[in-house]
Design a protein with these regions (language model features):
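Single conserved hydrophobic/aromatic residue that forms the stacking wall/gate
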Residues: 1-7, 11
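A glycine-rich helix N-cap at a beta->alpha junction
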Residues: 79-95
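Conserved phosphate/anionic-ligand binding catalytic regions in large, soluble enzymes, centered on
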Residues: 33-51, 319
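A short, small-residue-rich loop immediately preceding and capping a beta-strand
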Residues: 54-67, 88-91, 198-200
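Thiamine diphosphate
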Residues: 19, 53-55, 97-106, 116, ...
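Hydrophobic, small-residue-rich alpha-helical packing segments that form membrane-like cores
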Residues: 111-118, 128
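Active-site-adjacent bridging/hinge elements
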Residues: 9-25, 293-295
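Active-site nucleophile and cofactor-binding loops and adjacent substrate-binding regions
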Residues: 22-41, 62-70, 91-94, 100, ...
């Protein structure tokens, strides 16, 4: 072989015929680390701190199974925060139910909870490509334009679904952590109905949308659909506002971002994510009406996505049941209507809690 140079490859690579061949290029490089999370994270950390150690900023992306991120190399992630790293961690195949067939070891239901323990890690659970683009653009501006010492953790899925074009004016909400995706109304010949707020994140947002259509078609219940791009960012903002209000009692109270966005909302709330209930429960204080949280507590299972979401009780039918339950508690519908829905969806009321299985 000839020697390599800083300019580019100047030698013939023996693995050139492979898909993931080794390549050096001024425009960037891909390191295929294999099953070596500690080594890969160390490489990312070296690049993420190069702005300081070498006075040359790099923009590293480390893509990995989300279960094998913070859970496996948590101390290195903490060191990344301590070292003021800048870069992107991409938790692929994220969520408890999106990675069907790989069971307990691979299915992640808590990486966002772990990410939130690192003060300068900003974490997002994106559903659509336009959300991902907005988040990455914001990260590039903050880390490399304004030179702020954050790093980003973004979860992505391996599930195929349609990605719509970006709606007008949603960028601020995506970055802050929540925005309205749609409002589901009834046909004109139907009377004024009950309204609810359905909030979803990541791949489970599609189950939320499907549930909203069932509620409209079968129960004459309208809904506002919200994408929760970052529960953690919303909670941090809320806690910052709480602190300010506590320390400034003589001044007018401020409102958290999510409180301002939901101030004029109508009806109770259901939050459904592909993560443990504790993730969504963080928002309870800032929700202006009754709230029911669905999540994927328990160990993973090997099965289809449809079966997994039913098992963990986060599919469209459990979202409908949770909605009807909260409406029954508010005396807006009868308990019998809830009971009929449980029978209609063939839900086993004696089903064991997935947490204990």
């Amino acid at each position: 072989h000839e020697n390599s140079s800083a300019a580019s490859d100047v030698y013939k690579r023996q693995d050139r015929e492979q898909i993931m061949y080794y390549k050096e290029d001024k425009k960037g490089i891909i390191l295929e680390e294999g099953i070596n999370e500690a080594g890969a994270m160390s490489a990312w950390l070296a690049l993420a701190t190069s702005y300081s150690t070498h006075q040359q900023a790099m923009i590293p992306f480390y893509i990995f199974y989300s279960m094998f991120g913070f859970q496996r190399i948590g101390d290195l992630a903490w060191a990344s925060g301590d070292s003021q790293a800048r870069g992107f961690l991409i938790g692929a195949t994220a969520g408890r139910t999106t990675l069907n067939g790989e069971g307990l070891q691979h299915q992640d239901g808590h990486s966002h909870i772990l990410a939130n323990t690192i003060p300068n890690c900003k974490s997002y659970d994106a559903t659509y490509a336009y959300e991902l683009a907005v988040i990455i653009q914001d990260g590039l501006e903050r880390m490399y334009g304004k030179k702020e010492n954050f790093f980003y953790y973004i979860t992505t899925m391996n599930e195929n679904y349609n990605h719509p074009s970006i709606p007008d004016g949603v960028e601020q909400g995506i970055i802050a952590g929540v925005y309205k995706v749609d409002s589901i109304k009834l046909t004109k010949n139907k009377k004024k109905s009950i309204n609810v707020n359905l909030m979803g994140a990541g791949t489970i947002l599609h189950e939320v949308i499907a549930a909203s259509k069932i509620l409209a078609d079968d129960y004459s219940i309208t809904s506002d659909i919200w994408s929760l791009t970052s529960i953690n960012e919303l909670v941090r903002d809320g806690q910052e506002i709480d602190r300010w209000n506590m320390l400034n009692p003589e001044k007018n109270k401020k409102m958290a971002y999510i409180e301002r966005i939901l101030e004029d909302s109508n009806g109770p709330f259901v939050i459904a994510t592909d993560y443990m209930k504790a993730y969504g429960e963080q928002l309870r204080k800032y929700i202006p009406d009754d709230l029911h949280v669905l999540g994927t507590d328990g160990f993973g299972r090997s099965d289809s996505r449809e079966t997994l979401r039913n098992f963990f009780e986060v599919d469209r039918y459990f979202i409908v049941i949770a909605t009807l339950n909260i409406l029954a508690q508010q005396d807006k519908i009868s308990a019998n209507e809830l009971k009929r829905a449980i029978k209609t969806f063939d839900i086993d009321v004696d089903k064991l809690n997935p947490l204990i299985l």
